[in-house]
């Protein structure tokens, strides 16, 4: 098999998963570089980069790169492709060629996003791309149009991937295996895929109408022609809120596996509760979108509903957190690097969840909307939730993917540096938000200097952690410590073929004997 046949025309779920992981790692470094530019600008009062337009282009690109080209490709494309077929005993994904197309739509999409910043003044709209700022008056030229096309491609990629994962998870498992006997990671990817399938078409509709408003003189979002910019916000957030659950749900699945494994348990605590909690989160995620819009002047009854509905999501989330803690209870805990990431995840995700409950209150949110408190909140659940879950999964399954082991001491040190960095970066932002510092500005009054400086120092510590991780991965490949026989394979099906598994697995159907 030639290099080109293997890597460009691949129909193998393991190879495509590897492509997704490499692409996501690369995009993650681009997104990190952008975030360091943001923190460099905000490290001291005064201007570093120039005007707010270039600053907002960087902020917008940082969000898009991290969401669409780092977290989703790694969690869904990388871990999803590698593990879902192995965990259900399928020979591959249901639609292997469509799987390849889903991946190869992402590099062109990334290219279009980068192109958007090189023409005119760039797309400095924020990741929400709200009109009228995103309209053709405030953003003349092709920048926003290129960003919209980038989102179109990334969206098509995700929709096709979602169809593939739904079909695979439901139809490719052995007949004897009920859906309620599949591992939690498979469930998490299945639910994520359903969310993608239902939410992305709404985003596509919204940005397509924005595209025609900009180029074909329609007025969907222009009051002068009977349109309404608030309609765009509803369409965007009907996608945008499920999207944040799309980013965290596969992480929930990863953490369930890692915690169970390193607590020495043969199953997670409360399997059914975990499944129904994820199903509930997936459903509720669709009926809370307007909590992002408490400041647009909605009716008081509407605000009351969205406040209460948002708070209800804390219940299934709490079920998951306490089930992880119950899984740990009474276990023989192995303090390996993946376990450290998982414990860090549980702690920091819970803090992020608590600030989310604060922001759910529509009255409080009037004061905190577009302030740094919101930035702190969602970076606790993303930068320390999604990213910690990715690193837990990566350190846990690295031997499965490569056949080599990471250096345990280096990996623990990396956790320590990263934990320090992200907390020093984002904890002070709660204080800035409560003190009234607004988001998306490149400068600030000098009263805010202390916490901003600390936050920027934290970002440099996190950068050090990223460099450490690159070294740790290099060291693992250079030292070639092989895994001879993985343990606990009876309850962790993905490991039964050895490390790494052969190119083709389950070529003949798996024999499944269901325990009564």
From Swiss-Prot:
Q: Name one Pfam family in it.
A: COX1
Q: How is the cofactor bound?
A: Binds 2 heme A groups non-covalently per subunit. Binds a copper B center.
- For the ligand (Na(+)), the binding residues are 41, 46, 442
Topology feature Mitochondrial matrix, residues? 1-12, 88-95, 172-183, 263-270, 329-336, 402-407, 480-516
What is the protein's membrane topology class? Multi-pass membrane protein
Swiss-Prot/TrEMBL catalytic activity:
4 Fe(II)-[cytochrome c] + O2 + 8 H(+)(in) = 4 Fe(III)-[cytochrome c] + 2 H2O + 4 H(+)(out)
Pathway, per Swiss-Prot/TrEMBL? Energy metabolism; oxidative phosphorylation
Q: What PROSITE patterns does this protein's entry cite?
A: COX1, COX1_CUB
Write out the residues that bind Mg(2+): 369-370
Disulfide bonds, paired cysteine numbers:
none
Name any one GO molecular function. Answer: cytochrome-c oxidase activity
- State where it is primarily located: mitochondrion
A Gene Ontology cellular-component term: respiratory chain complex IV
Its family remark reads:
Belongs to the heme-copper respiratory oxidase family.
Under what name is this protein listed? Cytochrome c oxidase subunit 1
* Source species of the chain: Buteo buteo
The protein's gene is named MT-CO1
